[in-house]
Each structure stands twice: as C-alpha cells, then as structure tokens.
C-alpha cells in the first residue's frame, strides 16, 4: 500500500512513512493510492466481535508490511485497553430509527482518543525500531491537543508541542493539556483563533530547514493514520445495526472534516452507508459549500461548540481531491485561491460532493434547545457538539434506514453549556475528579512563526 499527495508533487510513501511525515512536502495531504475492499461476509461477521478485532480487519490492508501482524495487533490492544466501556464505542437509541454512537469513553473523553491512542502506540513502536526521535507539533480547537498529550506523555522517542487558541477552549479541554507533568509534553496558548494555530502549524511544515532540523511530525487530522483509525467505528456500529443487509446513515458534527471523511472511506471500502450528513454550527462554511455557495472564508464566531469554530477545514482537501478526479494540479489551484479568501467548486466536482455528502447547520439556540430536549425526552446529556448533530439528523432520516449520530465528546468537557441548557452540572468520571485541583503548566506564545520555532528548538529534548 502506497500513499500519494493531494497536490501530486510529493513522493509516494509507505504507511509508516506517511504516518511519521504527516503533511506532504508539497503542502498536500496523503491519501491511499487505492481503497481496499471488505466483502459482505466479512462485514456481517463483525456483529458481536470485539472492537479490537474489527479494528484489525478494517485497518490491516492499509498498513502493508511496515508493521508485522504481531506489532499491529499489540498496538491496537494497548490503544483501547484503557477505554471506560467494554464495547469501546457503544450505541444508544435516542428515538425510533435514531441512534447515538458514544465516542467519549477514552482517556480524554472525546472521539479523538480512538485515533490518538493508536497513533501513540504506532509512533513509539516505529521510532523505537528505527532508533529515532521526533518532535510532534499540533494545533487544536480543544480535543485533539488533549488526546495527543495523553497519548504521547512520557514516551521516550517523542517531544510534543500543542498550539491552542488562548481563551477559546473549555476549561476542561485546557486542563487536560496543561496538567500532565511529563517533561516531553508542552501546551502553548497562542494568540488568535484555531485557524491561526493551524496556519502556523502548516508554516512550520513548509519550512523544510526547520522541519528537518527538529524532525517534525504531525498528529493533526492532516495525518492519514488519524483518519484511518476513525474508519473503524463506522464498521462496528453499522454491523451492530444490521449491515451489510441493511443500509445505515450517519450524521457527523465536524469542523475539520476528518471524521466524516473517515465515513466516506468506509463507504468506499464497501460498507453500505446510505447518507453521510455533515453537521456544522454557526461557523457553517462546510454547509454553505455543500449547498453550492462556494468555499469562502469568513470571521470565526466563538460558540458553545468550540471544536467546530473553524473556517479552514483541512480534510476537505481530501474530499476535493477525489471530487476533482484525483487531479493534484486542480487541488493546488483551489488551495492557492483559498489563501486569497476562497474558491468556487466546479459543477462536476460539486455534483460528486453532493452525491456523497449532505449537510445541515445548528444555531446557538438550536444547540441549546437540543441539549434541553434530549435530557427531557431521552435522559441523555449531550455535549454541544453532539447536540449539533442530533439537531441536524432528523431532516435526513428516512424510514427503514437507521441514522447514527456521532456523540463526539462527554458532556462534562463542556459543563457550562450543558448546565445552562439543563440545570444539570455534568460530572467528570471518577478518574478525573481532581482535574480542577491539579496545577497547570502552560506557555503563552504570540501568533508569530519565528517566536514559535525558537520556543520549540529551545524546549525540545536533544
């Protein structure tokens, strides 16, 4: 299995090199040259299987021979051993034909744990074998950073620096990044919004002297391994609901498009997905684009679902690459236009996108009302991001086809919004009950590339 860049000018790589590289050297994102297929018999057999077994079946064809079977199984088993639910990703019925996929039973209470815990194990295995050390730099709108720090804290071959927008994430998200005591992890509170953090991250990857000098690696959802790990729970949940004999639809709250793109990959692999619904908050650039209005950046408006407060949706580039017939030159042109503010999608590419994705949006009042109603009618406490999905989903439900909405985070990660909507203060799990008492360790940094590079050089282990 080889991986190619969405911009067509970077060398093809193995899975291991793709994972350790992150962003391609031409600025593009890596995607597999071909999509492996999983037949109906194999999908049917997944019903009732342990999550780890399904994960091995789904991901193994993408990995090739860069990890042995024993190495890969070991990484999977260690990654999910610490999850707080035996099913790892349990389904809960909300309403007739509408299910919630709980993706918040990992160590940091968010769906990012499914990928990040696995990547931590894969990185450590590969780097130990190679005798190498890397510097991971990531940007987060809240959940990616805490998941990355949790996954890599204390590992011998990795230094981790996470950029997050100062004052624009929840207190729980911040404390999950700032309270670990291991010396190899660093939380950097940067001036600006998430798009600024993501832009500086890409600037660092495009500075090849810096990139090579510190052996830069990335674990944002630009990293293909992140997307791949998220493909698994589409298979596990669909099989539990009757796939392959029954089609299943999914509604995905998303800002950076990686989680819903994982669903698209599952569909391309042969999983009978009927509808993939992109659910956005008031920062609705993806909904506007998929509605035929072009992709044009605006001002990021802070919301109660901050992980979706994004204007530059990195993984959308992967969707555009396929929509434009895998034409790297066309994607490069679009990304150049995006630097100037935005672009229009060609008629043919838009038709392809709309063949695969539907979309909807939730206002702040919609989100709050959905949290209130869900508790009253179902007894479920929803985080604001999950509530965005639950609000959007009903318009896309069709009789006879189950709809699964991805519950992306535990409500206790956003206690203020949940309490304002319900009067209930969601409690953290017992293992995190002292989070608010732990001392914090963070560094304020400017939105300045030179200052960021200097800080990383000075504070990484040599």
Per-region residue spans from a language model:
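PLP-dependent amino-acid enzyme catalytic core
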Residues: 1-462
